[in-house]
């Protein structure tokens, strides 16, 4: 049984990470009307609705509206973000997605942002969102050479949520509803990487 669906609400991203497979498709964002239509078709067929594929969902100005609409239709909304726009994502937090996953390696993939400020914004958001009931997952790669900053990042995170942490299946539980998880870099299902496919969220 299929329990989740990845719905690409935009393929536009504000970063250019080395580990991202990227896309050559036309830059587009889902309209509220199209989102309503697609979620109506998915209603009753899947449980978890992931607002993620190639783009950065926090760039979409209708994201809080989409989260609210998804909840009203019985979906469990989950977001994955590069974390660089969290300082202006209060409306997203207030819309209360079930879970938000923040890729802490977006900094390493670009090498432009101030790392301390990046971690500060991620942790400030995570602590506040968790207090409102949102599960916050901070993601770290464990392969492909992008794990060299892991210990440094963990030490910086510990400055906001001190150790000891509780070890869990894929990483650590830092506090109530705040986790660090290790994972592999994204791979297309069944090796499908063709840009000639008609697939996509649009």
What does each model-identified segment do?
Residues 1-100, 109-120:
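Conserved alpha-helical substructure of the radical SAM core
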Residues 28-30, 50, 73-76, 94-202:
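Radical SAM enzyme [4Fe-4S]-AdoMet core and its adjacent flexible, acidic
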């Amino acid at each position: 049984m299929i329990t989740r669906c990845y719905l690409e609400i935009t393929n536009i991203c504000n970063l250019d990470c080395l580990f991202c497979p990227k896309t050559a498709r036309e830059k587009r964002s889902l309209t509220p009307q199209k989102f309503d239509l697609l979620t109506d078709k998915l209603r009753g067929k899947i449980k978890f609705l992931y607002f993620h594929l190639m783009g950065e969902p926090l760039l979409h100005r209708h994201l809080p509206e989409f989260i609210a609409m998804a909840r009203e239709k019985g979906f469990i909304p989950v977001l994955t973000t590069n974390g660089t726009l969290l300082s202006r994502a209060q409306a997203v937090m207030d819309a209360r997605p079930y879970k938000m996953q923040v890729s802490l390696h977006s900094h390493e993939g670009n090498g432009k942002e101030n790392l301390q400020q990046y971690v500060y914004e991620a942790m400030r958001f995570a602590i506040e969102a968790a207090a409102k009931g949102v599960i916050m997952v901070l993601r770290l790669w464990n392969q492909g050479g992008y794990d060299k900053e892991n210990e440094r990042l963990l030490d910086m995170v510990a400055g906001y949520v001190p150790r000891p942490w509780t070890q869990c299946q894929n990483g650590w539980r830092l506090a109530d509803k705040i986790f660090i998880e290790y994972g592999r870099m994204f791979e297309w299902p069944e090796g499908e990487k063709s840009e000639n496919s008609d697939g996509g969220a649009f």
